[in-house]
């Protein structure tokens, strides 16, 4: 039976609850315990799949096809435990489930209310798989005091009462602002946040306090006194130069020991932090630097490409180099020559996206990389734009483009080298889609197999010809153009097992030019870098010696 750790936040959002949860999960693993992490989001969207990247940041996709919060990416990267659909839920999903049950008559004519029906649905979600692990860490999105979060806070209060004493603890993450004028850390916002938490029936066992620097002992004792926690359960979460120092930093602060003490687990197994010490060493002691341009549509919010940035960092670790990322707005290249902007970069990455805006700029970035022999990695839309560039400028397919852009414009303008994917095989089933289907949850989502061409670069990179990668797309390169494109030198080096869907393309006469329809960044980890990113950074390292 799992022990439950509920992580809440106060004062302000974006303090790092997800990272704190992931780091704690990693520390518990280092002591030999099994963990699973969950995210409960109070927003009313059913999932983040239809939310703007500017609004929400990256959508993290699981193997089983769930579109989830980017925090699940942190959970996977730090613990290596693959997230599932049952590890992410929103108010929208909870209310949808309750209303579906009401329509079916599951409640036998009762008046449906937040308490007990909504809270029971939340508790049922939290309980899924509780017999599988030693610790279940559940992060509640938002901050204490948000009206949207009240059903979740009430649900975890009830949940802790339903369980035997000592099976649930609460960890509260707050901000200790530093006032330069007085030279002081202020504890009052944290005190008020805990007061708000206690007013709804929740008392924190552990306080994690985000601050710019160390927390003096006097402030720790003050927080312990007024927030009713043990002094050694007041944990400093100082600003760090890299998120990969978080497990070691939290261990030095005693977070994992405070959790074990709260559960009265004694004697506690000693942690083995060897792999995190190695990760930290690789981050802080690089033997060189490479510059990589990410040419994207949502570069104003870097969280929109969170997993890509982290995967590049992992690739840097594998090659003992620091990866310096520079964000380039693809729209700039629709009006300007890309050469002055891209000269000096050791590699170019074009990530995914939706809609026509910025795509001509991405096509120009792919053209620049091809013509100037710069290592190029195109992901999802980045692969599609590389294929369109090849079709237009090498294969002689005039007017090559994507059906996505025609659908957006409401008229046919392009030769559809990229088309709307209407059916595909998922396991033993055929999935069908129409252009006018709902947007939510209708893409080709989750893990799919691919078969690589023997002797291709990607087969060499992966060390084999059978792979499984995660997807999130509704448009696909049309295989009917394959022969014409391959005659021009663009190799279709990865296909779906039935041979109908192109998964990978590469230029055979280029030092390193690969486009993939899937999202390899979603499976990369600091202690297990994805082979594509590791080899891409290796190619950038080679390129840096030539520039």
From Swiss-Prot:
UTP binds at residues 13, 186-191, 222. PROSITE patterns: GATASE_TYPE_1 (PS51273). Allosterically activated by GTP, when glutamine is the substrate; GTP has no effect on the reaction when ammonia is the substrate. The allosteric effector GTP functions by stabilizing the protein conformation that binds the tetrahedral intermediate(s) formed during glutamine hydrolysis. Inhibited by the product CTP, via allosteric rather than competitive inhibition. ATP binds at residues 14-19, 71. One of its GO terms (cellular component) is cytosol. CTP binds at residues 13, 146-148, 186-191, 222. Mg(2+) binds at residues 71, 139. It catalyses: UTP + L-glutamine + ATP + H2O = CTP + L-glutamate + ADP + phosphate + 2 H(+); L-glutamine + H2O = L-glutamate + NH4(+); UTP + NH4(+) + ATP = CTP + ADP + phosphate + 2 H(+). Gene3D superfamilies: 3.40.50.880, P-loop containing nucleotide triphosphate hydrolases. Its EC number is 6.3.4.2. L-glutamine binds at residues 353, 381-384, 404, 474. Homotetramer. CTPSs have evolved a hybrid strategy for distinguishing between UTP and CTP. The overlapping regions of the product feedback inhibitory and substrate sites recognize a common feature in both compounds, the triphosphate moiety. To differentiate isosteric substrate and product pyrimidine rings, an additional pocket far from the expected kinase/ligase catalytic site, specifically recognizes the cytosine and ribose portions of the product inhibitor. PANTHER family: CTP SYNTHASE, CTP SYNTHASE-RELATED. Belongs to the CTP synthase family. This is CTP synthase. The gene is pyrG.
């Amino acid at each position: 039976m799992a022990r439950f750790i509920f992580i809440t936040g106060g004062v302000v959002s974006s303090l790092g609850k997800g990272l704190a949860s992931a780091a704690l999960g990693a520390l518990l693993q280092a002591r030999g315990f099994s963990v699973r992490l969950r995210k409960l989001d109070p927003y009313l969207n059913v999932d983040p799949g239809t939310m703007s990247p500017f609004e929400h940041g990256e959508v993290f996709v699981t193997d089983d096809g769930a579109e989830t919060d980017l925090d699940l990416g942190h959970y996977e990267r730090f613990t290596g435990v693959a997230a599932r659909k049952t590890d992410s839920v929103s108010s929208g999903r909870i209310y949808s489930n309750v209303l579906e049950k009401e329509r079916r008559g599951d409640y036998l004519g009762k008046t449906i209310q937040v308490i007990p029906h909504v809270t029971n649905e939340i508790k049922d979600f939290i309980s899924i798989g509780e017999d599988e692990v030693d610790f279940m860490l559940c992060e509640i999105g938002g901050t204490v005091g948000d009206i949207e979060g009240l059903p979740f806070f009430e649900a975890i209060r009830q949940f802790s009462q339903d369980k035997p004493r000592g099976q649930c603890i609460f960890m509260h993450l707050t901000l200790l602002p530093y006032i330069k004028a007085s030279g002081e850390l202020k504890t009052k916002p944290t005190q008020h946040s805990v007061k708000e938490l206690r007013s709804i029936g929740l008392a924190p066992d552990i306080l994690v306090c985000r601050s710019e620097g160390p927390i003096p002992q006097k402030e720790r004792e003050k927080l312990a006194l007024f927030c009713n926690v043990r002094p050694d359960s007041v944990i400093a979460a100082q600003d760090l130069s890299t998120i990969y120092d978080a497990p070691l930093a939290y261990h030095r602060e005693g977070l994992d020991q405070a959790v074990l003490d709260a559960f009265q687990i004694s004697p506690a197994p000693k942690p083995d932090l060897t792999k995190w010490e190695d990760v930290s060493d690789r981050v802080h002691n690089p033997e060189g630097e490479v510059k990589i341009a990410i040419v994207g549509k949502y570069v104003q919010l870097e969280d929109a490409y969170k997993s890509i940035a982290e995967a590049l960092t992992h690739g840097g670790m594998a090659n003992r180099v620091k990866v310096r990322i520079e964000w380039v707005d693809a729209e700039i290249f629709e009006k300007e020559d890309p050469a002055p902007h891209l000269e000096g970069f050791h590699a170019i990455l074009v990530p995914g996206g939706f809609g026509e805006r910025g795509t001509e700029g991405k096509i120009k970035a792919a053209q620049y990389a091809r013509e100037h022999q710069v290592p190029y990695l195109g992901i999802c839309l980045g692969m599609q734009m590389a294929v369109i560039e090849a079709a237009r400028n090498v294969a002689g397919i005039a007017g090559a483009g994507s059906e996505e852009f025609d659908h957006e414009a409401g008229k046919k303008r392009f030769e559809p080298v990229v088309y709307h994917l209407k059916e595909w095989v998922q396991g033993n089933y055929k999935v069908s889609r129409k252009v006018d289907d709902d947007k939510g949850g209708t893409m080709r989502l989750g893990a799919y197999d691919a078969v690589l061409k023997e002797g291709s670069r990607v087969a060499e990179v992966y060390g084999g010809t059978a792979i499984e990668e995660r997807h999130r797309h509704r448009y696909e390169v049309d295989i009917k153009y394959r022969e014409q494109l391959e005659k021009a030198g663009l190799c279709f080096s990865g296909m779906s097992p039935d041979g109908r869907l192109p998964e990978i393309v590469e230029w055979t006469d280029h030092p390193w030019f690969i486009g993939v329809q899937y999202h390899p960044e979603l499976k990369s980890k600091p202690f297990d870098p994805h082979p594509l990113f590791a080899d891409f950074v290796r190619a950038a390292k080679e390129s840096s010696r030539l520039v």
